[in-house]
Design a protein with these regions (language model features):
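Extracytoplasmic substrate-binding proteins
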Residues: 90-95, 153, 158, 164-241, ...
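Short helices/loops that flank or line small-molecule/ion binding pockets
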Residues: 143-150, 173, 272-281
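Bacterial Sec-exported substrate-binding components of ABC uptake systems
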Residues: 2-104, 201-232, 281, 334-347
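A short, structured surface patch at a secondary-structure boundary
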Residues: 94-149, 153-166, 261, 289
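Short, structured coil segments at secondary-structure junctions
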Residues: 112, 131, 172-174, 256, ...
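A ligand-binding cleft/hinge motif common to bilobed small-molecule-binding domains
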Residues: 161-172, 284-305
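Short, solvent-exposed loop/turn elements at domain surfaces
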Residues: 104-109, 124-129, 239-244, 287, ...
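His/Asp/Glu-enriched short active-site or ligand-binding loop at hydrolase and phosphoryl-transfer sites
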Residues: 120, 246-269, 289, 312-315
């Protein structure tokens, strides 16, 4: 900054206090002097404001205490109401009766075994089913015994197993009647799901049904490229009869790329002649015998009359093959594997 001119310094050799304060100092002093009355007035009003603030704080504190008290009273009232309220009634598990072996197996697979209170006389699988009371067989049901057990659900195979009179009684007593007659492999997991839904065991039934669905799909996928094989399914030997137009057996055979030589027969389980079988000359004979001696005799019979080699004579568990329950899917897998071995032998 350049020095001040000499004339300026000479003209003001001595300045008073006011000149030293300058305009800014004079302004600050005025503000200070003018503000004293305001400050004094504000100080005079402090007691009133303090009293008001105290009253406000007291009022707020009282309001908070009142709200807290009301909340505590409400909690106490709710607790008292909960104590005085009657207990929630528990719903008794549904009670079910099975009138067919495959239905018993379906209900067990669905996790509903604890709901079963009785079964038919042929239900022997799983082994625990043998311990349940009996209410008749596949053809005759004891109505008095069935109604005496007071079931919520009755699972039957077909309507003629029940009869119109018992159906009427079940309807009058509000007992549900459910028919379970699978006509294809996919129906088996579907009935397992139904059992899970109706008996509240879906947590078990749904994953089991999904597993069976996947197994069926895998069987169809694996067998679809196999060459079709003609088969004769021997159900009984004296007289000789077979399964023809049974839709479930047809689905089992088609899943394994097998063709029933009696698929076009008018009857479901016709009696047939040996001559007719010889005329149709199947590539494979499928039997289902438990007794080893009987099985050996039947295989020798077909070796003699049809000239079939041992690998063309197949045998399966009769209960697994002829009961439309979960084990039929495993029997289908075994049949597909045996047919694949036959194809490998003749290719």
């Amino acid at each position: 900054m350049p020095p001040l001119p000499a004339t300026y310094r000479l003209q003001h050799p001595k300045r008073s206090v006011w000149s030293r304060l300058g305009l800014w100092g004079l302004h600050s002093l005025c503000v200070l002097l003018l503000g004293l009355p305001i400050l004094t007035q504000a100080q005079r009003q402090d007691p009133l404001q303090s009293q008001t603030q105290t009253q406000t704080q007291t009022s707020t504190k009282q309001s908070t205490q009142e709200v807290q008290s009301q909340q505590q009273d409400k909690k106490a009232q709710n607790a008292a109401a909960e104590q005085d309220a009657p207990p929630t009634p528990t719903v008794a598990p549904a009670r079910a009766i099975s009138l067919a072996p495959h239905i018993t197996e379906i209900l067990f697979a669905a996790g509903a075994q604890d709901h079963l209170i009785a079964v038919d006389s042929s239900s022997d699988y799983p082994p625990a089913a043998k311990d349940l009371p009996r209410v008749g067989d596949a053809l005759r049901v004891n109505p008095e015994r069935l109604l005496e057990l007071k079931p919520d659900q009755v699972w039957a195979w077909q309507a003629n197993q029940i009869g119109p009179e018992l159906q009427r009684q079940l309807e009058q007593t509000h007992i549900s009647l459910i028919f379970a007659a699978p006509e294809k492999l996919d129906d088996i997991p579907a009935f397992i799901r139904l059992a899970g839904d109706s008996l509240d065991t879906a947590d078990v039934a749904v994953p089991i049904a999904a597993l069976l669905d996947n197994q069926i799909a895998a069987l169809r996928q694996n067998s679809r490229l196999g060459k079709t094989v003609s088969v004769f399914l021997e159900i009984g030997s004296e007289p000789l009869y077979t399964l023809a137009r049974d839709p479930l057996i047809q689905d089992v055979l088609s899943t394994c790329q097998a063709q029933n030589i009696y698929a076009r027969h008018a009857a479901v389980a016709p009696t047939i002649s040996l001559e007719d079988v010889l005329h149709k000359h199947p590539q494979v004979v499928i039997t289902a015998y438990r007794d080893p001696a009987q099985l050996r005799a039947r295989h020798l019979f077909w070796e003699k009359h049809l000239g079939l080699s041992p690998h063309a004579l197949l045998n399966l568990n009769p209960d697994a093959l002829y009961r439309p329950g979960p084990r039929l899917i495993e029997a289908t897998r075994e049949l597909c594997e045996q047919l694949d071995r036959y194809r490998a032998q003749v290719s």
